[in-house]
Structure formats: C-alpha cells, structure tokens
Amino acid sequence: MSNIIAIVGRPNVGKSTLFNRLVEKRKAIIHDESGVTRDRHYGLSDWNGKTFTVIDTGGYVENSNNIFEKKIKEQVILALSEASVILFMVDCKDGITSLDYDFSKIIRELNKDTILVANKADNNKLEINSNEFYELGLKNTPMIPISSINGSGTGELLDLVSNKINNDDKLSPVSYTHLRAHETWSY
C-alpha cells in the first residue's frame, strides 16, 4: 500500500486550502474563482510518525465541454488512480450539489479507502448540517466536518488518514519523482 492521499471534489470546496494546511506551506494558489487549480500539486505531510504524499487537484466537473475542465478532469482521474486514500471534499455552506452526487458515484466504483471531508463547518450549525452528506451513499466511509481555513477538525482528519496508511514512513521513489516532476508543472 502506498502512502498517497488525493484531495478531490467539485470546484471551490477548499481542496487547495486543506492541501496547504496539510503540507504546512502555501504551495497551492487559493482563490474564490473556480478553475484556478488545473493540475495536480504534490506535497509531503506527516502525522503521528507517518509520512505521506498529498495530491491537490482541481475541481471535478462532469460532462463539461470546456477544454480546461476536461483537462482538470483528466488530472483528477490520474490522482485517484495514484492514491491509496481519497479525501472526498464537500462544502457544508452550499450543501449537496448534483456535482457531489456525480462524483460520489465515481468514488463508490473505485472501492478505495475514502474519507468524506465536510469542509467549511465553521460553526456548530454547519457542523450539524454536515450530516446531510451521508445521503451521497458512501457506505462505511467515515465523514468528518472540518474548517480548512481555521484548522478545526484537521487533527481528527489526520488521525483517520494515519490509520489508513501503512506504518512504514518511507515513501516509494515514485512519490519523490512525482514531487519533483509536478512541483512547477502546468499546462
């Protein structure tokens, strides 16, 4: 089992903000406008003595004719194929969208370790509302409400991640190759 974690979801759910928090660097650009992240970004993180690679992806949009959204979708699919654990991120403020349903079907078909990350749970009401995401039908998938902006819930998220990756904190050479190859890559 590899120690590769992919952060995926629809546009503007906070994937890049969480990525920056996990790698403890501002490597991914964060913006309110969708489509800013177009390729995969790689970084290293560690928690409880376990080191793992984190992949940030652009926002997944199904059946788009936009050339950029098609390329983003390709990058997301590649990240999903590389990952041993998927962080499927949704937005508590917006609630469930049709894109969340579309993407949850893909996640179910992959049959990989997944954690449903209900982001933007910035207060108790939003945290309670995060329970609606169980409607996505991801059975046996833990769901955790977080706020990637202020960091609440990220410790618990990292506990879940570290329980799903192997105990050997050595990364495969492939992980380091990806880090070097994609750190500045874009199209």
What is each model feature region?
Residues 122-171:
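Canonical P-loop GTPase G-domain recognition
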Residues 13:
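ATP-binding Walker
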Residues 77-140:
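Conserved C-terminal guanine-recognition region of P-loop GTPase G domains, centered on the G4
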Residues 16:
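Walker A/P-loop
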Residues 178-187:
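Single conserved hydrophobic/aromatic residue that forms the stacking wall/gate
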Residues 53-65:
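Switch II (G3) loop of P-loop NTPases
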Residues 24-48:
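Switch I (effector-binding) loop of TRAFAC-class P-loop GTPase G-domains
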